[in-house]
Each structure stands twice: as C-alpha cells, then as structure tokens.
Curated annotation (Swiss-Prot):
This is Cadherin-11. The keyword Acetylation does not apply. GO terms for cellular component: adherens junction; catenin complex; cell-cell junction; plasma membrane. It comes from the Eukaryota. Residues 23-53 form a propeptide. The gene is CDH11. Keywords: Calcium, Cell adhesion, Cell membrane, Cleavage on pair of basic residues, Glycoprotein, Membrane, Metal-binding, Repeat, Signal, Transmembrane, Transmembrane helix.
Length: 792
C-alpha cells in the first residue's frame, strides 16, 4: 500500500513537470527559417541574393504514459512565409501521422492523440511540408523530424528466472561465491535512474549475503554443516531508482543446497559383535554382518572393512557390501568344533576417500571386536583319502581282493561305519564290498580288452544315522596279461604274376594284438616248421613288426594252379609269448612286363570282396528268379487287362441319337465304347487317329526274352509300358478326341427329362427300360410322356 501511494505521488509530480515542459516545448519547438543564397542578376550587372526559405528542425519530445483528458501538445510547425492569413497549409506524414500524431493545418500545432509507451517504441520519424492552401503547391521542401518518447519509471525490475537453484560445499569459508542473480529493467537506462538497480537480501540472513551492484550471493557464516541443515531458501530483491524511495522492485527465490564433504569419520554403534557358525558350514558361507555409520553421503560415506587382528584371521575373511555399506564376515576354511570352538576378530572400518582439507578431523576409521562361536554339527563320515586307485589282473579268480577303503566318524560319538557300492557305477556287478571293513573284491573275471578301467563309487554311512553318508570315487585298473595271440592286421589277399621273378617281393604284412603294448610287439613272423622250405614262397621278418612275402621260384601258371594258401606263424613279445597261425591267400594272375595285372581269376575278385563262389552263385540265382517273377507278373497283368472292346450282352453298339448337325463324319457318329473309360490304362497322352496313318509301322511285339545280367528291372518295365502305350495296332483303333470338347458349349442345349418328354417325336424310347441298370438314367431321361406324368 505504501508503494502504491508513493507511485501515485510520483505520477502527480511527473504530470506537473510535463505541463511545464509542454509550454516550454511550444516556445522552443518552432520552425525557424534558414536563408540559403541564390544568385540572380539585377540592374547594372549587380548580383543580387534572393532568399530561399528552408526548414531547420529541433527534436520534439513527448512524455510516455500520459493519461490526461486532452491530447498532448508535441510541438508547433511554423514558416516565416506564413503571414497568418490562412493561405499556408501544413501537412504531416510519416510514422503514426494521422493516427497517433495530428497537425492543425493552419497553426501547425502537433498533438499526440494516444498514450505512448517508450518500451514499445522510443521514437517516431515524421515529415513536415508547407503548401499553398488553394493550389496545394509546395511552398517549402519537405523535411523530416523526430519525436522522441520521454521515459518515466513505469517498469519494475524483472529477474531472468523466477527460481534459482545453487550448490555450495558445506564448511565453505565466508565470502564463498554461491550464484549470481540478474534482473533487468525495461525503462530507459540513459535517462534518469529508472533502470539503475540495487540488489538486497530479504530472506536467508545471516547465512548468506548479496552484493548490491552485481547480485552475487556469497556465504556469510563459516562451517555450515550439511548434516545439521542441508537446504536454505533465500529471497533476493532488485530495486530501481538506485534503491531510493519511490523505486519499483522485483524479487526472486534462490534455493541453496549444501553439498557433502568428507568431514565425518565412520563409527561403529557398538564395541563388540557376537556371531555363531556351524562347523558344517562350507567356505564362502556368510557368518554375519557389521556396519559402521557415516553421516556423509556418496563417495564421502563409502567405508571399506578389513580384519586387522585376531586368532581367526586365517579362518575368516570380510568383504564390503557397497550397496548396504556393511562388512560381510565369511568363512574362509572348514571349521572343526572338536579342534576349536570360538574365534575373535578385530575389524576396522575406514573411509575410502579422505579429503585432505579435513584430515585434522581424523582419523577417518574405527575398529570393533567380532567374537565367533563354532557350533557342533552331526557330520557325515570322512574317507581317509579323497579318492582311491587300485589294480587287479585280468582273468583273476572271483573273490580276488582289489583293495580297501576306510572312513571314520569325525564326531565324538565315533559311530560304526558301513560300506556299499553305488550300483549305478557298477551296472554289470563286477565288484562287491565288505560292508564292515571296506574290502573290495571281484565277482567275476575281468577282461582288460573289454574294459581297461572301472570307475565306481563307494558309500560310507553311519550305522545309527544312515542319513549321514559320504561318497568316494574308486578307480580300478585291470592289469593286462598276455591272453591274446597276434593276428593279421587286415584280411590280406595277395596276387602274384605268372611272370614273377625269383625272390621278388609281392606283399608286406603286419600284425595286431589286443593285449597291452607290453604283451604285444615286437612281433615275430615265421613259416610253420613243416613248410619252412616252401618251394613256392619265402617269408622275411623285417623286424619292425612287419614281414615281406617273396617268390621263391619262377614259372607260375594259372592253368596249373591259380590259388595258393600260405600259413604264417605270428608270435608276440609277452611272457609267456602267444602265437597264432594265419593263412595268406595268394592268387596267380596275368601281368604285363611292368608287373601290372591284366587278368586274374574272377573268384579272386570275389574273394577279395569277402564273397565265396557259392555265395556269388546264390546271389545271381536270386537276381534271376526275381527278374523272372517280375516279367511273369507284367505279362499276366497285360493278358488280364480288360479288353478295350467289350463284348457283353448288355453292350449296345448302335447310335442312340445321331449328332449330324455339324456335318460330322464317321468318327462323329460312331458310338463310344464305355469300356475305354473303364480301362484308364489304355489312355495316355498319345491317342491314335483313324484318319491319320502311322508314320512308321511297329514290328510285331517280341516275346519275352531272358534279361541280360546287368538288366535294370525298372527300365525293363517302363520300356514295356511305353511299347504298349504307343502301339497303334492295339485296340481301340478309334479316336476319342471329340470328347475333349466337353464343357465348351453346344447348340443342342442341355438334356432334361422335361424337355424330352414334351418333344414331338416319332421315336419310342421305351426299349431303354430293358437295357438294364446301366442305362437306367438314360431310360429316365427319354421315358414316355405318360410315364413322366405318372412319376410326377
């Protein structure tokens, strides 16, 4: 209310000032003539100067926001040629002429008819001209002048933002800059103090202050603590007129938040923590949690935990949960209640980030004692070893002891233990175990060549607490004994040329032994003693587990003997050694001069494929029998085909209706044999025509002939079908091409019983009733009218 009264008084003063200014302006804002020399010759050759009148303008001023009842006098235009007789007319044009500014064309007085606002427009440019009232002839050249709107203090200061937000670290020194606020005033800064602003603080003292000229807000108190108060609300005022009475003002709100610094150390809320853990807990299991409180936030409140002392440093560890800022105590090793029942730890909590400016507030850490009690647990039996490996010879007698496992009860009760084999790991039941002492024995003989390692699992359970069990893996290795004789590494079959030279090598053989390498190689190759001096072939042991077979003589002949069987004895290096006699089949073949095979006994190739002569004959016989069956089946099927021309009692080989409207020939009038449709096998894409002679004549169909050895049954059948389909001599030797026009329309229209019944015709179709069921539909269509009437 006080500000409104002051504003009202100021406006009254400005109005009085304006009135006096208007009178002065009327006196001063006159047009004065200015003489410009113009040369003109006079009498006696004198040069006379003729006066040319011109305009010399001063700026006009008009005060803004005038609200009086009468138009404001801006100024007066006057020319010295105006004698006051009313012959001169003043004309005003330009910005706002006739709308805002009007002129009295006789006196030249200019008035403002509307209230002006300098903040909308500060000046107007107008043009004045004096003309003859009667002729409108210009008496003076037009000239421009400016009307300036004079400012008054009618706009309060305005801040750029209605609300400001700023941050400043807690415990900042006095005078620390927080934020700068800025206000603006729409009034003319070049005229008076209307736009001269002064800042002051209305709310927020004594914590903050503001610089009057710049608007910079600074801290005013030291050691402001965020933990005590985090947010402050400050109100800043900007006042024009240099802050003097009568000036206008505006305000803004500033929210200032104290940001955190690490000025507080972590503190444990208690001096001792009590925890307990079962001895059955596994390493890595959580035992408990501790937490030190730090009022700081963010990274300034981060705390790291560590164990710095205690008798449980080797048994426990502590990690930091950064989400909850807790220290998590975890088990590091397996506990034993019977060995140690309690532990003590000294845990330290320290800040991760320390601000050097506040190091004097330290130390930024705290310690606490953690006492952990171990609880007794009913533990399962424990094997003395984590795994067992035993050996047993293959082919050992049933009941042979393989080895012994042993487990004990770790509890003080020391309960009795019983053992068993996990049968899922011994499905064939090769082993058994003594339930009382843990001795593992064989049940049946083992074969290393079948299974070299047996991996089983053994359970140990307490007699009185069978839910407590332990499991241990047992690996049993079957030790090899030399129980397999060596044999040929492959099914060898050798070929020797008829022209082979003496001592010529023609094959190299090797051996294989299922036994272990200790009982296998080195292999020894030899001929049996009874044929050590074989006249045809010799054997050479290469001493690298291979042997070469050589020709001892020349002159082999297939006509005399084309097959030789050479027994070879192979011995291994085991103790005792094992040996076997293997027979090598040698074929005599014809070869060229280079030793390449040209021809050989067919049986050799058959045997090379693993087939004997008898087997080959049986296979060929089966193939021939199958071919004969297929050929007979095809022949019988063709003979049993329904004839294309059916001679039955009910078959009618005459015309029912003669369709000769289009001048058709014999093919159009001959009846169609229904048997053709009944036998679709006789119809294919190739349809012979009666009116077209075949381009070539088919030979008489040959009879069945024996198929060649390489016959393809599928090709044979397809060939026969093709011949039957394309044979023009086979019935029907007729064309059914006319039936391909079905559906293309007919001039005869559709057949119906109604139309036929009403047709005037001499034909009698009653005989159709005697043709049997096959022609019943036709008889119904062409029945007599009386019959039709009776039926209807």
């Amino acid at each position: 209310m006080k500000e409104d009264n002051c504003l009202h008084a100021a406006l009254i003063c400005l109005g009085m000032l304006y009135y006096s200014h208007a009178i002065t302006t009327e006196k001063l804002n006159h047009v004065r003539p200015s003489l410009h020399g113009h040369h003109e010759k006079g009498k006696e050759g004198q040069v006379l100067h003729r006066s040319k009148r011109g305009w010399v303008w001063n700026q006009f001023f008009v005060i803004e926001e005038y609200t009086g009842p009468d138009p404001v006098l801006v100024g007066r235009l006057h020319s010295d040629i105006d004698s006051g007789d009313g012959n001169i007319k003043y004309i005003l044009s330009g910005e706002g002429a006739g709308i805002i500014f009007v002129i009295d064309d006789k006196s030249g007085n200019i008035h403002a008819t509307k209230t002006l606002d300098r903040e909308e427009r500060a000046q107007y440019t107008l043009t004045a001209q004096a003309v003859d009232r009667n002729t409108n002839r210009p008496l003076e050249p037009p000239s421009e002048f400016i009307v300036k709107v004079q400012d008054i203090n009618d706009n309060p200061p305005e801040f750029l933002h209605e609300n400001y937000h700023a941050n400043v670290p807690e415990r900042s020194n006095v005078g620390t800059s927080v934020i700068q606020v800025t206000a603006s005033d729409a009034d003319d800064p070049t005229y008076g103090n209307s736009a001269k602003l002064v800042y002051s603080i209305l709310e927020g003292q004594p914590y903050f202050s503001v610089e009057a000229q710049t608007g910079i807000i600074r801290t005013a108190l030291p050691n402001m603590d965020r933990e005590a108060k985090e947010e402050y609300h400050v109100v800043i005022q900007a006042k024009d007129m240099g802050g003097h009475m009568g000036g206008l003002s505006g305000t803004t709100k500033v929210t200032i938040t104290l940001t955190d610094v690490n000025d507080n150390p972590p503190k444990f809320p208690q001096s001792v923590y009590q925890m307990s853990v079962s001895e059955a807990a596994v390493p890595g299991e959580e035992v408990g949690r501790v937490k030190a409180k730090d009022p700081d936030i963010g990274e300034n409140g981060l705390v790291a935990y560590s164990i710095i002392d205690g008798d449980g440093m080797d048994m426990f560890e502590i990690t930091t949960d950064y989400e909850t800022q807790e220290g998590v105590v975890k088990l590091k090793k397996v506990l034993d209640f019977e060995t140690k029942k309690s532990y003590s730890l000294k845990v330290e909590a320290a800040n991760v980030h320390i601000d050097p400016k506040f190091i004097s507030n330290g130390p930024f850490k705290d310690t606490v004692t953690v006492k952990i009690t171990v609880e007794d647990a009913d533990e399962p039996p424990v094997f003395l070893k984590p795994s067992y490996i035993f050996e047993v010879q293959e082919n050992a007698a049933s009941g042979t002891v393989v080895g012994k496992v042993h487990a004990k009860d770790p509890d003080a009760a020391n309960s009795a233990i019983r053992y068993s084999i996990d049968r899922h790991t011994d499905l064939e039941r090769y082993f058994t175990i003594n339930a009382d002492d843990g001795n593992i024995k064989t049940i049946k003989a083992l074969d290393r060549e079948e299974i070299a390692w047996h991996n089983i699992s053994v359970f140990a359970v307490e007699v009185h607490k069978q839910h407590q069990e332990a499991k241990v893996p047992v690996a049993i290795k079957v030790v090899d004994v030399n129980d397999n004789a060596p044999k040929f590494a492959a099914a060898y079959e050798a070929f020797v040329c008829e022209n082979a030279r003496s001592n010529q090598q023609f094959i190299t053989i090797s051996a294989d032994d299922k036994d272990d390498s200790a009982n296998g190689p080195r292999f020894i190759f030899s001929l049996p003693p009874e044929i050590i001096h074989n006249p045809n072939f010799s054997l050479r042991d290469n001493r690298d587990n291979t042997a070469s077979v050589l020709v001892r003589r020349e002159g082999f002949s297939r006509q005399k003997q084309d097959l030789y069987l050479l027994p070879i004895v192979i011995s291994d290096g085991g103790l005792p050694p094992m040996s076997s006699t293997n027979t090598l089949t040698i074929r005599v073949c014809g070869c060229d001069s280079n030793g390449s095979l040209l021809s050989c006994n067919a049986e050799a190739y058959i045997l090379n494929a693993g087939l004997s002569t008898g087997a080959l004959i049986a296979i060929l016989a089966c193939i021939v029998i199958l071919l004969v069956i297929v050929v007979l089946f095809v022949t019988l099927k063709r003979q049993k085909k329904e004839p294309l021309i059916v001679f039955e009692e009910e078959d009618v080989r005459e015309n029912i209706i003669t369709y000769d409207d289009e001048g058709g020939g014999e093919e159009d009038t001959e009846a169609f044999d229904i048997a053709t449709l009944q036998n679709p096998d006789g119809i294919n894409g190739f349809i012979p025509r009666k009116d077209i002679k075949p381009e070539y004549q088919y030979m008489p169909r040959p009879g069945l002939r024996p198929a060649p050895n390489s016959v393809d049954v599928d090709d044979f059948i397809n060939t026969r079908i093709q011949e039957a389909d394309n044979d023009p001599t086979a019935p029907p030797y007729d064309s059914i091409q006319i039936y391909g026009y079905e559906g293309r329309g007919s001039v005869a229209g559709s057949l119906s019983s109604l139309e036929s019944a009403t047709t005037d015709s001499d034909l009698d179709y009653d005989y159709l009733q005697n043709w049997g069921p096959r022609f019943k539909k036709l008889a119904d269509l062409y029945g007599s009218k009386d019959t039709f009437d009776d039926d209807s």
